[in-house]
Amino acid sequence: MFRMGLLAVLRSKQTKSTIGVMVTASHNPEDDNGVKLVDPLGEMLAPSWEEHATHLANAEEQDLARALVAISEEAAVNLHQDAFVVIGRDTRPSSEKLSESVIDGVTVLGGQFHDYGLLTTPQLHYMVCCRNTGGQYGEATIDGYYHKLSTAFVELSKQASCSGDDYRTLKVDCANGIGALKLKEMKHYLPQGLSVQLFNDGTKGKLNHFCGADFVKSHQKPPEGIEMKANERCCSFDGDADRIIYYYCDVDGHFHLIDGDKIATLISSFLKELLLEIGESLTVGVVQTAYANGSSTRYLEEVMKVPVYCTKTGVKHLHHIEPFPFPGSLLSSIVRYLCEEITPS
């Protein structure tokens, strides 16, 4: 962790931007821990700097200074440039001490820092992006984060054609992690008519133990600690709340997972319909990994006529195949364009 603090300072100096460090092991067991570095626009760390991170982490103690010099020279880092690093952590017992080690690494190289304390990983990504865009993306505070998301949700909800209490209730498995703390806070920003019920909220039970998004995805069944009735809307976070998965049980008790393949298919179909409506010839494509459901691939290619591209397994490969600055920018750019062209009916 100390060394990742050092690396974050070098990356900040090289990019002349704020860099984020998140202490978390995501969907892994509570006793594990790890670190994620966040690049200037809230995106994942550049692949070349992942290599630097690996080299630095594995360097012998007596070779540490030489490793830092080598990275600085290879990446053309101006060591006289100011550096600023923002830090967040999840709720694991070890996270606070480890984040202190990150801070030690930042300060030993003369970097400045802001410790946000307990955050979800998406919240830290947001903070980094806000700080590096002069506030254009939003206010780099927890309140700013909640306000931005809740405002967008309220506006989107106005266009939804749903009715009845069943459509206003969501049960959330928080994996006994940071997602519970932050969702409790965010509930105050959401409409009163929306019922968000929290389960596995950290008051008892261990992080990611028989619960959480990875458990649900891997075992294809509901998490422990949540009671599901037929057709109730349910979802699960992972340990640092940067992963979410939706599911429900039908009237016969069969479990149904609304996974990424299904969501990607729905979104691409929706965007394609909008493009056809305004007569645009833009092409919408979908990127999948080798673990993708083969039926979804065939449906997209053969029925929807949407091109599908395959990349290596892992979110970083899905991220870096996109020729835009940060995750979701391709989608958001298209959506913004469509919103300007189409008035919702």
Regions found by a protein language model. Name each.
Residues 19, 78-80, 113-117:
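Short, flexible active-site-proximal loops enriched in glycine and acidic residues
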Residues 37-50:
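A charged helix-plus-loop insertion that forms the helical arch/lid used to bind
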Residues 34:
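Glycine-rich phosphate-binding loop of ATP-grasp-fold ATP-dependent ligases
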Residues 19-30:
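Hydrophobic or amphipathic alpha-helical targeting/insertion segments
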Residues 9-17, 60-84, 153-166:
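Glycine-rich phosphate/diphosphate-binding loops that line cofactor/substrate pockets in enzymes
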Residues 87:
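Non-catalytic, regulatory and substrate/membrane-recognition segments associated with hydrolase enzymes
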Residues 25-26, 77, 275-277:
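Short, flexible, solvent-exposed loop/turn segments with mixed acidic/basic and small polar residues
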Residues 1-7, 31, 40-41, 53-55, ...:
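Phosphate-binding chemistry for phosphorylated carbohydrates and sugar-nucleotides
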